């Protein structure tokens, strides 16, 4: 299939475009030599297409990620998602308001399925009459890198100062009572001085993924203090690295961190004591991290993720009413070869 999407989440897109399809990534026009935000990733099956060139592209299905993209697709391609071209909506987030009362922007549409990234998110949103599905996260395996040589706590959070209570940034001083906390992520530097020097919290400059993984794996334990977000890819990456994890028992963390693969609780003191135990017992930390890696590979590996997406895309296109069919064979990064029937607009 040829799939259109906007590459708005680099980490998620990095996993998604490793399948066996063709990926048309909508980007703004740039001058020669400027960064289009896509080319630097080295994706083999994905190509950046300027917005003003989308009308000439043949597209089999659209993966929407923001409400405004529905109108954008019509404006830029002349085709209405759900009517003139198969489409689905990938929802990355938890509800922004009260979970029991927040209606999804596509809740009144039957023609565009909503794909959630966690079971918690599907449960929490009011999806109305829209068809729904869940494709759980999958991440490329960075490999077993854990050494835990530094008696420090690692956490990855983007924009920790702005997102504050949402990401549990306010909780970091509690954990800094046990050991220095190194905060990685976009705009982590904005935490400099926020705690007034009262806590051993060290922002780390934003690092490219490979270096981030290597540096993170040197820390003794990974902390996931997020109160209200979708399951962070950084938590799954830490588990893939072989790190022991300590996580708030919120949103999807209770599913991701299975018994014996880390410590999950809503009691911050209990989590703080777990951090202390991992710091003092490196052999136990290594053992728990190894079990966590095994669990992450089995449940959040790339092959499973891509196979589930293959199923969802095939079902979406097959269910679209205004179509004729053609057969395509493709192989995803997990080695699975699939023959599928793809619909094309009349």
State where each predicted segment sits.
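Aromatic "clamp/platform" in nucleotide-sugar-dependent glycosyltransferases that forms part
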Residues: 227
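Conserved catalytic-core segment of nucleotide-activated headgroup transferases in glycan assembly
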Residues: 124, 140-199, 203-209
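A charged, aromatic-enriched C-terminal amphipathic alpha-helix characteristic of glycosyltransferases
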Residues: 280-314, 318-321, 346
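Conserved acidic donor-binding segment of nucleotide-sugar-dependent glycosyltransferases
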Residues: 259-269, 277-282
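Extended catalytic core of nucleotide-activated donor transferases of GT-like folds
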Residues: 9-12, 24-111, 120-123
């Amino acid at each position: 299939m040829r799939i259109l999407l906007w590459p708005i989440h680099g980490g998620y897109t990095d996993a998604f475009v490793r399948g066996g399809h063709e990926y048309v990534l909508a980007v703004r026009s740039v001058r020669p030599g400027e960064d289009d935000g896509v080319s630097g990733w080295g994706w083999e099956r994905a190509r950046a297409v300027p917005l003003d060139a989308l009308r000439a592209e043949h597209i089999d299905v659209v993966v929407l990620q923001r409400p405004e993209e529905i109108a954008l697709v019509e404006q830029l391609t002349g085709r209405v998602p759900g009517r003139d071209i198969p489409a689905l909506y990938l929802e990355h987030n938890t509800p922004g308001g009260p979970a029991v009362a927040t209606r999804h922007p596509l809740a009144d549409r039957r023609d565009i399925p909503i794909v959630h990234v966690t079971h918690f998110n599907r449960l929490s949103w009011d999806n109305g009459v829209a068809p729904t599905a869940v494709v759980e996260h999958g991440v490329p395996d960075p490999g077993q890198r854990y050494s835990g040589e530094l008696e420090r706590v690692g956490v990855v959070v983007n924009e920790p100062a702005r997102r504050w209570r949402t990401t549990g940034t306010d909780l970091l001083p509690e954990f800094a009572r046990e050991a220095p906390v190194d905060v990685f992520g976009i705009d982590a530097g904005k935490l400099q001085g926020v705690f007034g020097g009262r806590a051993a919290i060290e922002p780390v400059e934003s690092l490219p993924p490979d270096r981030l993984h290597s540096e993170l794996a040197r820390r003794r334990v990974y902390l996931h203090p997020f109160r209200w977000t979708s399951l962070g890819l950084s938590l799954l990456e830490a588990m893939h690295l072989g790190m022991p994890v300590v996580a708030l028992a919120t949103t999807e963390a209770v599913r991701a961190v299975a018994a014996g693969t880390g410590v999950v609780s809503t009691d911050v003191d209990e989590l703080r004591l777990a951090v202390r135990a991992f710091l003092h017992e490196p052999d136990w930390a290594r053992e728990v991290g190894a079990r966590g890696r095994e669990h992450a590979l089995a449940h959040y590996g790339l092959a499973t993720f891509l196979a589930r997406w293959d199923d969802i895309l095939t079902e979406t296109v097959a269910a679209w009413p205004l179509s004729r069919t053609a057969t395509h064979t493709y192989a995803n990064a997990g080695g699975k070869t699939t023959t599928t029937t793809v619909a094309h607009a009349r």
